[in-house]
Amino acid sequence: MKRRLFIQTAAAGVAAASATVARAENAEAELSPVGLVNLTPQIKTSRVGFGTGVHAGMRQSNMHRMGNGIGVENMRYAYDCGIRFFDMADSYGTHQFVAEALKGKPRDSYTLSTKIWCYPGGGIPEKERLPADQLIERFLKELNTDYIDLINIHCLMSPDWVERFEYQFEPMEKLKKRGLIRAHGVSCHARTAAEIAAKHPWVDSMHLRLNSEREKMDGDWDQNVAIAKTAKENGKGVIIMKVLGEGTINTPEGRKRSTIAVTRMPYKDVMIVGFEAKQHIDEFLENVAEGLKLEAK
């Protein structure tokens, strides 16, 4: 009887210790700028992501213009810092850079997000604006992967986007069922489009523009926070882009103010920034860490 009681007591002690460790790990993750978050039921990733579309279109971006492999080097540095979400688009022409940066890394250690351009004019050549199931093989080859975590309809700018682009819904849903993608969503560049996306049942995740300085975003802070809140209430992943206004918030004070504000905004999962130097990554992560500490008080 004593031996049984000892075993039971010891087992209870181990369970309590395990629970304490788990709580400590969760608390540490909650305060880490690169802690893991659940973007969708299928995708767990870092709360900070690396964007590759600064001043991008027709498969050119600042990552191309920098040259000399600087973008690849920056992404490798970001990965080493714990950033594991990498955001791309067909119209950015950055698939190959991300594939090069992540070569040799375990596939389950990072998240790939890309976008399909559907609007007439700009973006990519007209003949290449195809349904997702006709693009997936090229995307997989360019990214050197067997699956893509998240594919989005890119740059929604009008409230009629459902009627215009629902031809992409079924192909993407089939790709998800086949395991070639894990989730599908939209990238919103107009508030009217975002308001619809926040409620639409097809949308697993949405990109929303938000910063404290109202740069490169549609509407004010409160209007966009309300959209993010609606999206979260409807079970959607929320990715905040333009946190630094695509470089237009160009003072240390402004960047810190906006980063902390977005970090403390509760209705989001991931924040993405188009980092162009290692010191930009360091500064952003420091500001996110400060925002998390302030929120935890």
Put a short name on every predicted segment.
Residues K2-Y110, A261:
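N-terminal binding-site loop/beta-alpha segment at the start of enzyme catalytic domains
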Residues R4, P33, L156-K297:
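Beta/alpha (TIM)-barrel catalytic core signal, keyed to glycine-rich beta->alpha loops juxtaposed to Asp/Glu
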Residues T40-Q42, A99-R107, L140-N144, A198-P201, ...:
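Acidic (Asp/Glu)-rich catalytic clusters
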Residues G49, F85-D87, D149-N152, G185, ...:
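Conserved beta-strand positions in the central sheet of alpha/beta enzyme cores
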Residues F50, F86, L112, I148, ...:
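Conserved, mostly hydrophobic/aromatic
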Residues V54-N68, Y119-L130, N250-T251:
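Active-site mouth loops of central-metabolism enzymes
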Residues M63-Y77, E128-E142, H189-I196, G254-T259:
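Short, acidic/polar
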Residues L143-P159:
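Active-site groove signature of glycoside hydrolases
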